[in-house]
A protein has these predicted regions:
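Elongated, amphipathic alpha-helical interaction scaffolds
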Residues: 1-280
Length: 280
C-alpha cells in the first residue's frame, strides 16, 4: 500500500504553532512507537515502521494535529488536550479529509478499481483539571440536528484521561506516558504553592532528580520550561473565558426569563401591548 505524502511545513508556520510538552515528547519516533504499542497491544520494535505524516499548510488552515502518523495500514491522529472540546470529531474529519486528498492525488476516482485507504484512528489524550472518565467517546453525529436512525456519516474519537492515577494499565505499558503524567502533576501541585515560573523550574529539577523523563528534560530543559509556562497560561486564560461565557449566559437567561414573565403576566391580565413593551 502506498504511503501518504509527507511534507515539511514552512518555518514560519512552525514559529506560529504553539508546541506542547506532550508533542515535544512524542515527536520522537521511539517514544511514539511505545505509545502506539501500548494503545494497540502491539509489539513493534523498529521505529522506522512508523511514519510521521505532516500536512503542508494544515497549520495555516487551522487544522493542525499534534501527532499524525502511519503504522502498517493504519493512520493515527493523536492529540493532547487540557480542556474539553466536543468539536474534535469535526476537526478530525477536516484533517483526515486533507490526508486522504493528499493520498489519492493524481489518481482517478472514476475508475473501476477501488482506491484503498489507510484505516483511521482518532485519539485524544486529556489531562485537564475537569473531571473526566478514564475513557469516553466523541461522535460526529452528536452535532447533527434532528438525526433520525443511523447517521450516514460518522467519526468516532476516543478520549483517554491521562492524568496521574488514571488509565493505570495503559501507563504500565508506556513508561514515557506515565512519567509525563507525573511531570504534569508536579507542575500543577507546585503552581498552587508558588509563582508559575518557580513552580515549573522546581518540577523540572525534581523530575530530573527522581529519574522522571530525566534524559528528555536534561536535553530540552529551557524549551520545556518555556513551553510549560505558555501551556499553563493558555489553560488559565481559556478557563477564565469559559467562566465568563457561562456567567454571561446565566445573566442572559435570567433576563430572558424575566422578560418572558412580564409578557405572560401582561397577556393574562389583558394589558395593552404598548404597556407590556414599556415594562420590558
Amino acid at each position: 500500500m502506498e504511503k501518504l505524502a509527507t511534507t515539511v511545513s514552512e518555518p514560519h508556520a512552525k514559529r506560529e504553532y504553539k508546541d506542547t510538552v506532550f508533542r515535544m515528547l512524542f515527536s520522537d519516533k521511539e517514544k511514539l512507537l511505545s505509545l502506539y504499542n501500548a494503545m494497540n497491544d502491539r509489539h513493534y520494535e523498529n521505529a522506522e515502521d512508523l511514519k510521521i505524516v505532516t500536512l503542508k499548510n494544515a497549520i495555516y488552515m487551522g487544522m493542525k494535529n499534534d501527532l499524525a502518523f502511519m503504522v502498517d495500514t493504519q493512520i493515527c491522529l493523536y492529540e493532547h488536550q487540557s480542556t474539553k472540546n466536543p468539536n474534535m470529531p469535526l476537526r478530525d474529519m477536516f484533517y483526515i479529509s486533507l490526508e486522504y486528498q493528499a493520498y489519492v492525488n493524481n489518481k482517478s476516482l472514476y475508475c473501476s478499481t477501488l482506491q484503498k485507504l489507510h484505516t483511521p484512528k482518532f485519539v485524544i489524550f486529556y489531562n485537564g483539571t475537569e473531571d473526566l472518565e478514564e475513557c469516553t467517546e466523541l461522535r460526529l453525529s452528536d452535532a447533527y440536528e434532528n438525526l433520525e436512525g443511523e447517521p450516514n456519516l460518522e467519526l468516532r474519537v476516543i478520549v483517554l484521561n491521562v492524568s496521574e492515577g488514571c488509565n493505570r494499565k495503559l501507563m504500565e505499558h508506556c513508561q514515557v506516558l506515565k512519567e509525563y503524567a507525573q511531570y504534569v502533576a508536579k507542575v500543577r501541585r507546585y503552581t498552587a504553592e508558588m509563582e508559575l515560573d518557580a513552580a515549573v523550574k522546581r518540577a523540572v529539577e525534581e523530575c530530573i532528580a527522581e529519574g522522571i523523563l530525566e534524559d528528555f528534560l536534561r536535553e530540552n530543559r529551557a524549551e520545556v520550561e518555556m513551553v510549560s509556562i505558555l501551556e499553563y497560561d493558555k489553560d488559565f486564560e481559556e478557563k477564565k473565558l469559559r467562566e465568563a461565557e457561562y456567567e454571561a449566559g446565566r445573566e442572559e437567561g435570567a433576563r430572558f426569563g424575566l422578560a418572558e414573565g412580564i409578557v405572560e403576566t401582561g397577556c393574562a391580565d389583558s394589558v395593552p401591548e404598548p404597556d407590556i413593551l414599556a415594562r420590558l
